[in-house]
């Protein structure tokens, strides 16, 4: 059995994939590795549901540096510690998250609210997705030479509707997968 440890964007102590890797190295067990979650990485250093632009100032540069570091890790001896990559998009909020927004919860970290409600399948711009997921996964698979599992983790408020069918999620997921494979 393998255990995949994952940093979350709103984490108080472990909020980046680099934090996860440090802990994984301290645990030092062959079956203890990382789930590298694109949403948490992007929501921490690149995007924001609470800003009108949807982007953190300096986010492009922070993401570039983070991905360069990830590629170095994937190509090095620690690459085997990344067990799988998890993908979703992030929905652009217009208006931005704040008091009065339908997802607003007083006292809750904005990234947690975002994560729980508006993570469509990758590349679903028709559902507000705007993260650079295509560029991210291309870099991980080509330059990083990642050959492990890739999964989708979706939290989309539209799927809570009782009229929403599992078949619809499967269709959306398949469409996303096909589009990612074209990139």
Protein language model regions, located:
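A general structural detector for well-ordered alpha-helical segments in enzyme core domains, enriched
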Residues: 19-23, 66-74, 132-139, 169-177
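Short acidic/histidine-rich active-site segments
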Residues: 151-154
